Swiss-Prot record:
Described purpose of this protein according to its UniProt entry: Does not function as a copper(1+) importer in vivo. However, in vitro functions as a low-affinity copper(1+) importer. Regulator of SLC31A1 which facilitates the cleavage of the SLC31A1 ecto-domain or which stabilizes the truncated form of SLC31A1 (Truncated CTR1 form), thereby drives the SLC31A1 truncated form-dependent endosomal copper export and modulates the copper and cisplatin accumulation via SLC31A1.
Reported modifications of this chain: Ubiquitinated; ubiquitination and the subsequent proteasomal degradation are prevent by SLC31A1 that stabilizes it.
Any one cellular-component term (Gene Ontology): lysosomal membrane
TM segment ranges: 23-43, 94-114, 120-140
Name listed for the protein in its UniProt record: Protein SLC31A2
First and last residue of the signal peptide: none
Length: 143
């Protein structure tokens, strides 16, 4: 295995069954990794947007609700009960954790593909990352 970047139409990417031996196979592999890089950027933006949405929708302070309930002042309050708020928070946290795991796995797949030191693969990942950033980041500013 070469330890420097090379232009080649042959490579073994990630698994033995993903063995490329032709220019068409390399083009298809570059396209797959380009789309994975776009997906990675989309997941990154989606995770940030989801976290922002969760933080906006949760009560300002769960500890203030806990104090109010122990004082008996929350009977007339229209806020969420503490148990329900905690349950929502844990569900959102679990969802965020799953999204994070998916993002990490895709990121490591992309990194390992680049470590094949094939210049075409590297350029496909860089282009996919740029396209993903271009397409996904304007979504952060929309409500």
């Amino acid at each position: 295995m070469a330890m420097h970047f090379i232009f080649s139409d042959t490579a073994v990417l990630l698994f033995d069954f993903w063995s490329v031996h032709s220019p068409a196979g390399m083009a298809l592999s570059v396209l797959v990794l380009l789309l994975l890089a776009v997906l990675y950027e989309g997941i990154k933006v989606g995770k940030a947007k989801l976290l922002n949405q969760v933080l906006v929708n949760l009560p300002t302070s769960i500890s203030q609700q806990t104090i109010a309930e122990t004082d008996g002042d929350s009977a007339g309050s229209d806020s969420f009960p503490v148990g329900r708020t905690h349950h929502r928070w844990y569900l959102c946290h679990f969802g965020q954790s799953l999204i994070h795991v998916i993002q990490v796995v895709i990121g490591y797949f992309i990194m390992l593909a680049v470590m094949s030191y094939n210049t075409w693969i590297f350029l496909g990942v860089v282009l996919g990352s740029a396209v993903g950033y271009y397409l996904a980041y304007p979504l952060l500013s929309t409500a």
